[in-house]
Structure formats: structure tokens, C-alpha cells
Amino acid sequence: MTTPAQDAPLVFPSVAFRPVRLFFINVGLAAVAMLVAGVFGHLTVGMFLGLGLLLGLLNALLVRRSAESITAKEHPLKRSMALNSASRLAIITILGLIIAYIFRPAGLGVVFGLAFFQVLLVATTALPVLKKLRTATEEPVATYSSNGQTGGSEGRSASDD
């Protein structure tokens, strides 16, 4: 059975999106990619894959910044968010494709880095949210009456009402 949206626990983005942790994961993955690519004689592919990971992180940071600025307005518009997203994605995609074209075939690592970052972002965002949701459903929920006392009749007499 699914939980209705109004009953779902609120999960703040700060719980899910941790850019510093993502940065260190990206650096580690870029180092591994460079090591593996270097073993096969294509060190630049690993470097470009790392660049793609960093471009993906830049995109995620820009998403957070634009979402914060747009939702801070009194009447945020979906149109401004959509326009901002489309222009940002277009710029990063064009930049990635230009790098891939100029430095081909090794530059294609940028495109793979961007794609891999999206998978990484979903994984590192979804896992903490799922963990938070799981712990929220395991904790007992206290109910309060109109006089501010917790629900249940344990330890109370009938005259307490």
C-alpha cells in the first residue's frame, strides 16, 4: 500500500544532497578511472571522465542554487524553473559535446563522466532518503489530544477527561 503524498514524511534536500561528499567521491572515481585508463594506455580518457564528473557536480550545484533562489520568491513560477533548467542543461551539454569533439576520441570521456555522474547523483541522493523514510516509519508516532497530552489511556483514570 502506498502512502498518500500529504501523509509522507518531509525529507529536506540537505539530508539528501551532500556536495562535499559527492566531490570526494568524484575525485576518487576520477583517480580510479585515470589509473584504469592509464593501464590500458589511454590516460586522457580517464582525465576527461573526471572532468565530466566535475561538470556534473557543477550542474548539481547550479540546480540547488537556482531552486533556492526561485523558491525564495513569494510566487515561484514553474516557467522560470523550466527555463533555467533548460538553459543550464543546454550549456553543459554543448560544452561537453564541444570537448568530446575537439579532443576525440579521448574527449568522449567527458560525456561518459556526465552520464555516470547522473547515476551517482541518483544513488547518493536516493539512498539517504530511503534510509530516512525507513527510520521514520519504524519510529512510533505519538498522537496528541486537544489538551496537549499524548494519546492513549494508560496511566489515566476516567476522571482525567
UniProtKB/Swiss-Prot annotation:
Instruction: Look up and give the membrane topology term.
Output: Multi-pass membrane protein
* Signal peptide annotation: none
Q: Name one GO cellular component term.
A: plasma membrane
Q: Which UniProt keywords apply?
A: Cell membrane, Membrane, Transmembrane, Transmembrane helix
Q: What compartments host this protein?
A: Cell membrane
So which domain of life are we looking at?
Answer: Bacteria
Kindly give any further remark recorded in the entry: Was identified as a high-confidence drug target.
Q: To which protein family does this belong?
A: To M.leprae ML1138.
Q: By what name is this protein known? A: Uncharacterized protein Rv1303
- Tell me the organism: Mycobacterium tuberculosis (strain ATCC 25618 / H37Rv)
